[in-house]
């Protein structure tokens, strides 16, 4: 089994965090089984790496259902949607990742498919067009998105359960790291687990990726147990800083201080200097900086906070 799948929980019992969401899913699944009907359509939304795909896989495991994986941005034409829906067996789960990326011009094809399990197709040339109705077996569509606002209201309304992935706690992250380190056969004490968790941005995918890199260094350095020295060597090498910030986060903070002297700066100006797309800045670079109150948004743009200045000062002294 590939390592990523081995680390990934395969049951609700092994899934850490999202307690209310998991309880709701278990009730929905149990109800659908008792009614002998397909599970209602589900939409998960939240930041990258927080378990949306894992939850979809667990739902499929519990239902003992086939799961078909699709990337939303690849659904560009009607034929793409038809290819996904063609030849599915009853109770199949169709998982569309980044569902907000579907071409909006073909979204309507999904409406009748989700509501009535049919697709109406126009056939023939102008003047002789006919509507052919194609029946589909009952299925469950599970969507995942990092950008809920980009999903149209009509499509959102077709989902019976829209679930937000809430923030993971430090305790959640400690348990996730403990479980994953056991799978990777890494020996470490609770202090080291907490230390690694502090670099994870409370994101399971980041925590697991850090563990795999620590494993690589420990293996090459013949370390029997994981200590702080091994962890720090790993993080220094891959450019992970205190509180889990990356090199690009540090460049962003330094830019606000060194180039713009702590003044507010427009997003487009920052994007131009960093040579990064504005959406990359908004969705990837800024969230941890805003969450940790290292920068703030003002009417004039972005500005570093006192916390942000103190953070950079601490980096210099370490």
Curated annotation (Swiss-Prot):
ATP binds at residues 7-8, 49, 52-54, 158, 168, 205. InterPro entries: AAA+_ATPase (IPR003593), AAA_lid_4 (IPR041445), CbxX/CfxQ (IPR000641), DNA_helicase_Holl-junc_RuvB (IPR004605), P-loop_NTPase (IPR027417), RuvB-like_N (IPR008824), RuvB_C (IPR008823), WH-like_DNA-bd_sf (IPR036388). SMART domains: AAA. Mg(2+) binds at residue 53. Residues 242-318 are annotated as: Head domain (RuvB-H). It is found in: Cytoplasm. The RuvA-RuvB-RuvC complex processes Holliday junction (HJ) DNA during genetic recombination and DNA repair, while the RuvA-RuvB complex plays an important role in the rescue of blocked DNA replication forks via replication fork reversal (RFR). RuvA specifically binds to HJ cruciform DNA, conferring on it an open structure. The RuvB hexamer acts as an ATP-dependent pump, pulling dsDNA into and through the RuvAB complex. RuvB forms 2 homohexamers on either side of HJ DNA bound by 1 or 2 RuvA tetramers; 4 subunits per hexamer contact DNA at a time. This is Holliday junction branch migration complex subunit RuvB. It comes from Mesomycoplasma hyopneumoniae (strain 7448). The gene is ruvB.
